[in-house]
Structures are given as structure tokens and as C-alpha cells.
Swiss-Prot record:
Induction: By UVB. The gene is LCE1B. One of its GO terms (molecular function) is identical protein binding. Belongs to the LCE family. Residues 90-103 have a biased composition (Low complexity). Interacts with CYSRT1; the interaction is direct. Residues 87-118 are annotated as: Disordered. Belongs to the LCE cluster present on 1q21. This is Late cornified envelope protein 1B. InterPro entries: LCE (IPR028205). Residues 104-118 have a biased composition (Gly residues). The keyword Membrane does not apply. Skin-specific. Expression was readily detected in adult trunk skin, adult arm skin, fetal skin, penal skin, vulva, esophagus and tongue. Not expressed in the cervix, rectum, lung, colon, or placenta. It comes from Homo sapiens (Human).
Amino acid sequence: MSCQQNQQQCQPPPKCIPKCPPKCLTPRCPPKCPPKCPPVSSCCSVSSGGCCGSSSGGSCGSSSGGCCSSGGGGCCLSHHRRRRSHCHRPQSSGCCSQPSGGSSCCGGGSGQHSGGCC
């Protein structure tokens, strides 16, 4: 009898049943992340479209003033008389002269109202 009692004492205790995890407070579908801001060094100002000039290039023709031209730094400057916006290279007179778009104005140097990246 003593051996049987010892064997019962040596048996491991029954495993505890885990409790149900608390319900998540967050919704099932998390909110969509906003698009990542591109680096400042490769962007144009918002007044000229606010698009970035990536090395892969871009496209032109959105209703908000367009995107950057290929090569980086070039903004699409929308004209009031024409319906479509036209892309300009950074070397042209109607766009940024630098890829950063921060130090130089375009369109004759008259500032943002000329459609440049200042």
C-alpha cells in the first residue's frame, strides 16, 4: 500500500486549462497607413504639384498639377490656358534648376505664383 501511495504523490499535477485570451480592443482591419513621405531632397513644393523626382522617373498629367518628369526634380507646371499640364526638365526655364527644389525658384525667378518649386 505504501508504494501505491508514493506513486500517486509522484505523479505530476494535472495541466491547467489556459483561460481564453482577452478580446482585442483594436478593430480587425487596421487603418490604412498613409503613404510614406518621400525625402525632402527629392521633392517639389506643394504649389507645383508636390510630387517627388525619383530615379525611376514619374508621369505627368494629374488634375492637381501633375507629377515629376523623369530624371528627378522636374515638376509638371499646370497652365491655366491649357487643359493638360506639361512636364519640364529641371534644366528648362519653367521648372526647378536643382533636384532639391528648395533653393531656386523657377519661371523667371518670380516665386511660387509662377508655378515653380521654391
